[in-house]
Amino acid sequence: MEQTYEYAWIIPFIPLPVPMLIGAGLILFPTATKSFRRMWAFQSVLLLSIVMVFSIYLSIQQINSRSFYQYVWSWIINNDFSLEFGYLIDPLTSIMSILITTVGIMVLIYSDNYMAHDQGYLRFFAYMSFFSTSMLGLVTSSNLIQIYIFWELVGLCSYLLIGFWFTRPVAANACQKAFVTNRVGDFGLLLGILGFYWITGSFEFRNFFEIFNNLIYNNEVDFLFVTLCAVLLFAGAVAKSAQFPLHVWLPDAMEGPTPISALIHAATMVAAGIFLVARLLPLFRVIPYIMYLISVIGIITVLLGATLALAQKDIKRGLAYSTMSQLGYMMLALGMGSYRSALFHLITHAYSKALLFLGSGSIIHSMETIVGYSPAKSQNMGLMGGLRKHVPITKITFLLGTLSLCGIPPLACFWSKDEILNDSWLYSPIFAIIAWATAGLTAFYMFRIYLLTFEGHLNVHFKNYGGKQKTPFYSISLWGKNGVKKNSCLLTMNNNESTYFFSKTKYPLDKNGRKMTRPFMTIAHFEHKAVYSYPYESDNTMLFPIFVLGLFTLFVGSLGIPFNQEGGNLDILSKWLAPSINLLHQKSNNSMDWNEFLKDAVLSVSIAYFGIFIASFLYKPIYSSLKNFELINSFVKKGPKRILWDKIINGIYDWSYNRAYIDAFYTRFLVGGIRGLAEFTHFFDRRVIDGMTNGVGVISFIVGEGIKYIGGGRISSYLFLYLAYVLVFLLVYYLLFSTF
């Protein structure tokens, strides 16, 4: 086993040859490299599969031995400074490595077909492999310097992949927004690292924690300075994991290809902030108020992400806000000290959300045959509906991921979210109420996405995308609007017009929207073209990863079932995390009383089903359930209560669709303020500073010219002017200094 750990340093570098060889091939042999481009997809999958096998083997060793391994060697040594590099293999490392590799392999297989038509196919796989190297290097790092190096490389990969279609202005702006927002957190992370190095004199985790704990025990540190450094460290995690208030980049990051959203912005990169907090939890727990700050940021993000997901019309942005909310649950768990629950939810959410994103990619892929390549249309849930008949396999797997995220047993997220909800009662009743209420909101907005996408009829075939022109409560344009519209149900209505809970806005279609050429599935069928008027199911190379992730969603929750049976321990996750400490309630074993478990489970599932029921009531097409027509019609009738209810709903949806006006606030006050300062600085530099410099020259020139014309070349004039200057100088001197 010792020999196996000795070779673990190679894990981050195994995927690295792919981007290097692709780059060299495009420079030296561009034609041949492009001709055999699909070979590089195979190479990427093969190398990442090797890492996966290695990671699984190390994880088995971790579970059996309940230990960790660290190897460090000195890179620079002198009398005053030594920099050490190495790698650390512990339960947290092995969990993250398996997540990165398993989800990464599925995404790479999926991308081979999804990106087959794209001219940037090779560039895509080069970026993805380089991201795998960066992320694996991050999770195996043994000190803060290595963490920061790979942290920046991960941010670079995110920038490149979000802006993959950089010719689209929206994508270019999105990658810049993500880059700048993450730079704010990264700058804080760097300052925090330097601050703690100044305190402890070490970057390496074990020495760092030991020295710092001794300093705290002996009361030899300035708690104000230590708290500031800890907040700066936490700022890096806040930005990377899209926590409030640095969450604004994540929804715009959906401008990249959908496989990127599945791997980077759902399962791995956004989990880097959670990983950092989990890695530094022994540090944070001994600093006053930091753990409470982490939990506060987590609970705010939980609620904010869920409410902002309520009114999104873009399927990927809805899933992005869902990711933000679920990451908030993990951050809340870490702030409460529930280390096991946070990592458990990290595992289950990664597979469920990757399944949902790949499913949304399959939906978008099929919609492009009708509406064309336009993200504003192919990702618009208002143009979908009734897809269950056209993409049945995608529908089943998407429903599986939806129910998992809703917290329906026995799917994966039920087990992990239930633990966090139960632990929240031990920490704070207020936080618990918010967390449980948000669980209901999660079920509501996730089932809303499912119903708008798969139920009813294909809305793109209707003139107003609603099926019936004169049925206001049937239209499913409940998410908001593209711009400011006087008659939008999400804005204040005119006094002489009635308010409707559902929008009646009509969206025009392109004339040739229904007749599109089907993109090729494989190179062998490149010349095959067919015209489709309805969406079609994706190719097997896209369905296979979705199916595998569906299996993970079904069974991965069994890793952490929180009860034991006589004669055998079923809680594999607890054995896996045995070297770590559950800071919330340390127990000799992780068994749970069946009665307590069932009581909590019944309550959480009831809340989830209530959210599903409300979503079904509001979004399920009425013609599929005519029995409820009179009930729905009773809610549509006008009256004082109805008008008040509409105003409340319109306000909520307007607030949600406009992202709680946080982006607008940043744009107006931060971006606008910085732009105004830059313009003022430019004006001051060009007009004032340059004006003073140029003014001296101009004045000297004018004075010289004046003297030249006044003197006229006569000596008597020069003597007169000279005496006049002397007399003026003496007069000024007398007036100023005569009092002294």
Swiss-Prot record:
Its EC number is 7.1.1.-. Pfam families: Proton_antipo_C, Proton_antipo_M, Proton_antipo_N. It is an enzyme of class 7 (translocase). GO terms for cellular component: chloroplast thylakoid membrane. It catalyses: a plastoquinone + NADH + (n+1) H(+)(in) = a plastoquinol + NAD(+) + n H(+)(out); a plastoquinone + NADPH + (n+1) H(+)(in) = a plastoquinol + NADP(+) + n H(+)(out). The chain crosses the membrane at residues 9-29, 40-60, 89-109, 125-145, 147-167, 185-205, 219-239, 258-278, 286-306, 327-347, 354-374, 396-416, 425-445, 543-563, 602-622, 717-737. Keywords: Chloroplast, Membrane, NAD, NADP, Plastid, Plastoquinone, Quinone, Thylakoid, Translocase, Transmembrane, Transmembrane helix, Transport. InterPro entries: NADH_UbQ_OxRdtase_chlpt_su5_C, NADHpl_OxRdtase_5_subgr, ND/Mrp_TM, NU5C-like, Proton_antipo_N. Disulfide bonds: none annotated. It is a multi-pass membrane protein. It is found in: Plastid, Chloroplast thylakoid membrane. GO terms for molecular function: NADH dehydrogenase (ubiquinone) activity; quinone binding. It comes from the Eukaryota. One of its GO terms (biological process) is ATP synthesis coupled electron transport. NDH is composed of at least 16 different subunits, 5 of which are encoded in the nucleus. Belongs to the complex I subunit 5 family. NDH shuttles electrons from NAD(P)H:plastoquinone, via FMN and iron-sulfur (Fe-S) centers, to quinones in the photosynthetic chain and possibly in a chloroplast respiratory chain. The immediate electron acceptor for the enzyme in this species is believed to be plastoquinone. Couples the redox reaction to proton translocation, and thus conserves the redox energy in a proton gradient. This is NAD(P)H-quinone oxidoreductase subunit 5, chloroplastic. The gene is ndhF.
